Amino acid sequence: MKFKLNRTEKFLIRYYKPMFFSYFIILVLASLFFGFMGWSTIGRIFNTILLIFMFYVIFVPMSKAKQIQQLNDVDFDILSMIDACNQMIDAYNPKDITHLSSFCLFRIIGLINLGDFDRAEQEIKFFWQHFNLKKIHPSDIAQTHSLMANIALEKDDIKLFEDEMRIVYEYGNKPAIVGTFKHSYNYNVKGMELLSEAYFANRNNCAQDYEHRVFEHMNTNPLTGKPLKKKPKPMYYLMACSKLFMFYKNTDNNQKATYYAQQLLSIGNEQLNDYRKAKEYLENADRSN
């Protein structure tokens, strides 16, 4: 999962140094001009307005943009990721639904990876109750139901799991989600993961279908069939490996369970709940042999 920067944020990150330098030159020239003309009071008012404008229009948005950029660089240090999300949620304007909902989703994913399912469930319910869901993108809402389904599966609540996955399936067929494929390779993977989980829940050749859809779309644009110019971060691969490991482990397919457990160990770390399960599984398999 990656947070998107809008055009203004990208522009500020790229050009904030020359912009600050330009504003400094304007301040100096304005001070000299108003001083030369004997309009010192007007000069002070002008410079004050310019400084306020620079602070609120450039400095504050640029700082937030750089924080988002840093958050995108977080890999698998889950505790640091959750801490960063907490800081961003505290710092953001409550009306900025787009960014706030993304930070909340990222925090929920972190909690699930840590194995803190009760708190993750509380976070999802908070998300549903306190956000105006009409203003949130359908793919993000579908993601919350997908995550709740994961929690239900961990707690062996099969009815809740199937109910949540039906909702995911309904969202997965909405044009609003399919349409995002045109804009971001991250949404390609995210959207296909949601659809794959729906098939996974409906048990239509579930594991094979899931493998094909997720891993093929890690490298291919589903609209054009061409390879992606940018590769998605390993988190998607890790999440997919986690689900497939648990599926094959529970269906006694030891060969594939071992393969995906090894994949988890190669890309995860001790913080991850599924990493610990995979490690325990491989250790038990070694003792059995």
Model segments located where?
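Hydrophobic alpha-helical transmembrane segments
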Residues: 36-51
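Helix-turn-helix repeat elements of alpha-solenoid scaffolds
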Residues: 42-44, 70-87, 112-126, 157-173, ...
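N-terminal topogenic membrane-targeting module
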Residues: 53-133
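Residue-level signature for tetratricopeptide repeat
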Residues: 70, 110, 151, 196-200, ...
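Flexible helix-coil transition and linker loops at the boundaries of alpha-helical arrays
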Residues: 86-97, 129-141, 172-184, 219-232
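The tetratricopeptide repeat
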Residues: 103, 144, 179-193, 233, ...
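Structural register within alpha-helical repeat arrays
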Residues: 107, 148, 190-193, 197, ...
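Long, non-transmembrane cytosolic or organellar matrix-exposed soluble domains/tails
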Residues: 202-289
